[in-house]
Amino acid sequence: MDTTTSNPRIEASAKYIRMSPHKARRVVDQIRGRAYEQAPMILEFMPYRVCDSISQLLSSAAANANHNFGLSKTDLFIDAIQVDGGSFLKRIRSGARGRTYPIHKPTCHITIVMRMDSGWRNKISLRRFGK
């Protein structure tokens, strides 16, 4: 964690989320670079299961910013967010003639890096929505 107070780097990570990394990346790409206030609204109306895990992680990162640096949630934007593949949960499915077939259930690790907003980023992201 960056301890300088000029523009602190706030991190939060969630590991071993039971979701395919490919499916999680399609949600993460929608909120990368957005202000913190916009991201939960976007996630709330997306129909994907991973949105709940990402919104919990966002609120955790905002709580870290408030507790560790005393920053307000309105001053934050998502600087970087990445999804990495985790290990597979390996299960067995029984097949014909006494055989077994492997089932691989993927997991992923999500890391969010937030920074303090300098003001210009909010104006750009509001223009995207036509406001």
Swiss-Prot record:
Gene3D superfamilies documented for this protein: Ribosomal protein L22/L17 (3.90.470.10)
Keyword Lipid biosynthesis among record annotations: no
Keyword match DNA damage: no
Cellular component annotations (GO), alphabetically ordered: large ribosomal subunit; plastid
Location of the protein in the cell: Plastid
Classification via Pfam families: Ribosomal_L22
Listed InterPro entries: Ribosomal_uL22 (IPR001063), Ribosomal_uL22_bac/chlpt-type (IPR005727), Ribosomal_uL22_bac/org-type (IPR047867), Ribosomal_uL22_sf (IPR036394)
Subunit text: Part of the 50S ribosomal subunit.
Family: Belongs to the universal ribosomal protein uL22 family.
UniProt protein name: Large ribosomal subunit protein uL22c
Gene that produces this protein: rpl22
